UniProtKB/Swiss-Prot annotation:
Its EC number is 1.8.-.-. GO terms for molecular function: disulfide oxidoreductase activity; protein-disulfide reductase activity. The active site is at C98, C101. This is Thioredoxin-like protein CITRX, chloroplastic. Disruption phenotype: Yellowish coloration in the leaves. It holds the Pfam family Thioredoxin. Belongs to the thioredoxin family. Plant CITRX-type subfamily. GO terms for cellular component: chloroplast. PROSITE patterns: THIOREDOXIN_2. Probable thiol-disulfide oxidoreductase that may play a role in proper chloroplast development.
Length: 175
């Protein structure tokens, strides 16, 4: 019995100029980078607008235009804590350079949509509010404070990246 040859012989490469030129114009017609003049007159705010069920806090500014979680100053946070609330307050201490903080921001946005009427979620940039972060004993990032509307309950503090389900459990069961 004779051994079969396992040698692979690739087909001849088609590198003739006529073959390439016949394929090139067709390829350019479907290019992702081809610029076509736009006939649409929609503004960016019309495209990115989102309908919200409840109003976000009147103070502070959004990290991005389409986010529900607002970035607040230390003074604004202190007013929220001292003021009357019907819903729990979740404060996220973060930094723009912190990788886990970016991941946590995505989870907090999902929570903000999910608990839109039942919780208030805000952010504090620790680089902008260094003294406030120090006073709140923020040692690692991200740090979350879960503050109940009931002043007799203690605040819950977490440090580091935590799963979204753990945040749900804290909001639903402990606040």
């Amino acid at each position: 019995m004779q051994a079969a040859s396992l040698a692979f012989h690739p087909p001849a490469l088609r590198t003739s100029p006529s073959y390439l030129s016949s394929k090139l114009p067709h390829h350019l017609n479907y290019s992702l980078f081809k610029h076509a003049p736009s006939t649409s007159t929609l503004s960016l705010t019309q495209v990115l607008s989102r309908n919200t069920i409840c109003k976000p806090p009147a103070v502070g500014k959004y990290v991005r235009e389409d986010y529900l979680v607002k970035k607040l100053s230390a003074k604004e946070i202190q007013e929220l804590i001292k003021g009357e609330r019907n819903v729990p307050l979740i404060i996220d201490f973060y930094a723009t350079w912190c990788g886990p903080c970016i991941l946590m921001a995505q989870e907090l946005e999902m929570l903000a949509v999910e608990y839109e009427n039942n919780a208030l979620i805000v952010k504090v940039d620790t680089d902008d509010e260094y003294e406030f972060a120090r006073d709140m004993q923020v040692r690692g990032l991200p740090t979350l404070y879960f503050i109940s509307p009931d002043s007799s309950k203690d605040a819950i503090r977490t440090e580091g990246l935590i799963p979204i389900q753990m945040m749900r459990d804290i909001i639903d069961n402990d606040l």
